[in-house]
Amino acid sequence: MRKFSTNIHIRIAILRRDRQECRHCGEIAKNVSMEIDHIIPLSRGGRDVFSNLQVLCRPCNRRKGNRFAG
């Protein structure tokens, strides 16, 4: 599986859209590392589109793995 990497401008736009808060637990960026996550994982048919990306803190993203969000 390829490692997801995105343009810095898209990453910034997603961080702004999600108010730099983890979409799962609500943690804010100043307290923990944030990552851009695919809501529907690429391995499950998700796409590399803005609407399929969200901000998750590192712990939530690790727990989510390749499962669907929610």
What are these regions (language model features)?
Residues 26, 58-61:
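Cys/His-coordinated zinc-binding microdomains
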Residues 21, 40-41, 60:
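Short, flexible coil/turn micro-motifs enriched in small/turn-prone residues
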Residues 2, 60-63:
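Generic cytosolic/nucleocytoplasmic N-terminal low-complexity/intrinsically disordered segments
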Residues 19, 62-65:
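Generic structural signal for secondary-structure transition and capping sites
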Residues 1-24:
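Short, charged surface segments at domain edges that flank catalytic/cofactor-binding sites
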Residues 27-55, 66-70:
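Histidine-centered nuclease catalytic patch
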